A protein has these predicted regions:
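ATP-binding pocket architecture of kinase catalytic cores
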Residues: 1-34, 50, 68
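Active-site activation/catalytic loop segments of kinase-like enzymes and analogous catalytic loops
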Residues: 103-131, 144-160
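An alpha-helical support segment within catalytic cores of ATP-dependent transferases
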Residues: 27-76, 86
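ATP/Mg2+ or Mg2+-diphosphate-binding catalytic cores
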Residues: 52-53, 152-174
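Pre-DFG segment of protein kinase catalytic domains
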Residues: 73, 90-93
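Conserved protein kinase catalytic/activation segment
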Residues: 82-91
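Conserved protein kinase catalytic core
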Residues: 83, 99-101
Length: 174
């Protein structure tokens, strides 16, 4: 079964995602590292958006983030539609997979689906076997990075609507 965002709300599914992510992150390194600055520049080069202040803000957020020291094999595009159960959980669509901070995968799940604080903490706590509180500040950094990249990506796409960009922009500003 291909997941939809509502699957994340079902009992035990967030914990199942965390467990599956731990297995993914234990795989050998790919030898390619995710460079958010290069990705951002590629998106910015094709943006026709008049919100130059938000573009600049997103670029600053991304530039502040440095390549993490704790690299692991990451999916980097974990949206619900890239998760299936058949009967175990598997991830699809590996085109963005490369080495990155493991918390970027968690941040993608949290921010792409606009999970609330409680669900975000459950994911983090399950991923770190009950030690999620200690990792909340690092997750927040990765959430900010994901939102900035996601907004730039969305702004670079001709099929994106202004309503989508505005809604995501409000989330970035909170």
């Amino acid at each position: 079964e291909v997941w939809k965002p509502h699957h994340l709300e079902r009992d035990g599914n967030i914990e199942l995602v965390a467990t599956t992510l731990r297995r993914l992150h234990a795989l050998p390194l790919t030898g390619r590292s995710f460079d958010s600055t290069v990705a951002a520049r590629r998106y910015v080069a094709t943006i026709n958006n008049r919100d130059t202040a938000l573009v600049a803000h997103c670029e600053r957020v991304i530039e502040r983030m440095r390549l993490p020291h704790n690299l692991c094999c990451c999916h980097n595009d974990l949206v619900a539609e890239n998760i299936i159960t058949a009967p175990g959980m598997m991830f699809l669509d590996w085109e963005y997979a490369c080495d990155n901070d493991p918390l970027f995968d968690l941040a993608t799940i949290v921010e792409h689906h606009d999970l609330g604080e409680e669900a975000a903490f459950r994911l983090l706590d399950a991923y770190f076997d009950g030690d999620g509180l200690r990792w909340q500040p690092k997750l927040r950094e990765q959430q900010d990075l994901y939102l900035a990249l996601y907004w730039l990506w969305l702004a670079s796409r001709p099929d994106s609507t202004q309503d989508e960009l505005d809604a995501l922009g409000r989330r970035i500003e909170r």
